[in-house]
Design a protein with these regions (language model features):
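Single conserved hydrophobic/aromatic residue that forms the stacking wall/gate
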Residues: 1-7, 11
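Residue-level preference for alpha-helix termini and adjacent loops
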Residues: 2, 79-80, 99, 129
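Conserved alpha/beta enzyme-core scaffolds, especially Rossmann-like or related mixed alpha/beta domains
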Residues: 9-16, 30-92, 102-117, 170-182
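Short, mixed-charge, low-aromatic patches
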Residues: 14-20, 46-51, 149-158
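Glycine-rich loop at the start of a catalytic domain that most often binds anionic cofactors/ligands
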Residues: 21-29
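General N-terminal targeting signals
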Residues: 26, 89-91, 140, 147
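Alpha-helical recognition segments enriched in aromatics with Gly/Pro capping
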Residues: 96-99, 106-182
Length: 182
């Protein structure tokens, strides 16, 4: 029965996503422009009130939700990726990489299919979220190998602890897996 189980509202902020363009309705647009493609949690708050743009946005969302007077749990993607909370799910994605690509690739346009990977590495030198094709899976070390267009070199990164993030479709499935949502 629908009401026989306890339920809780969990709100997730996708604050590991790279910002693609400068919102026109915010101050300090030059500050944002120089930080494009970085996770929202790595971009300074253009309003100058919080540590990051994501913290600013997260606080606005929390204030909004409090107005409805119901209990909720608020979680930051950045914190969950970096703390290792998602590591079990990331490993499951890694171990099923080919099967996942076989499901996702037919849903993408031709250009995107050529560069798609469920994993998006975070560039160690620039901090940007990279949308690059994974060249190799290092199965023994649980790392992805890719060509970094910023450094013009082949690099690798661990799939764990916030060194990369997942594309949104795979990210949602991973969250449901880790959180035990059925």
């Amino acid at each position: 029965h629908l009401f026989s189980s306890a339920a809780s509202d969990v709100y997730k902020r996708q604050d590991m996503d790279g910002l693609r363009k400068v919102p026109q309705n915010i101050p300090n647009q030059d500050l944002i422009k120089e930080n494009l493609e970085k996770p929202l949690s790595s971009i300074p708050d253009p309003f100058g009130k919080f540590e990051s743009f994501s913290e600013h946005n997260n606080n606005k969302l929390i204030d909004f939700l409090k107005g409805f007077e119901f209990d909720f749990i608020f979680k930051s993607s950045t914190e969950q990726y970096k703390s290792g909370k998602f590591n079990e799910g990331l490993e499951a994605i890694f171990d099923n990489y080919e099967d996942i690509c076989n499901v996702i690739l037919p849903t993408l346009g031709k250009d995107r299919r050529e560069t798609y990977s469920p994993f998006l590495p975070i560039c160690k030198s620039s901090g940007k979220v990279l949308q690059v094709k994974v060249k190799e899976l290092n199965k023994s070390q649980k790392k992805i190998v890719y060509f970094n267009p910023i450094t013009n070199s082949e690099e690798d990164c661990s799939i764990f602890n916030g060194e990369c993030k997942l594309q949104w479709k795979v990210d949602w499935a991973m969250r449901w897996y880790v959180l035990g949502i059925d």
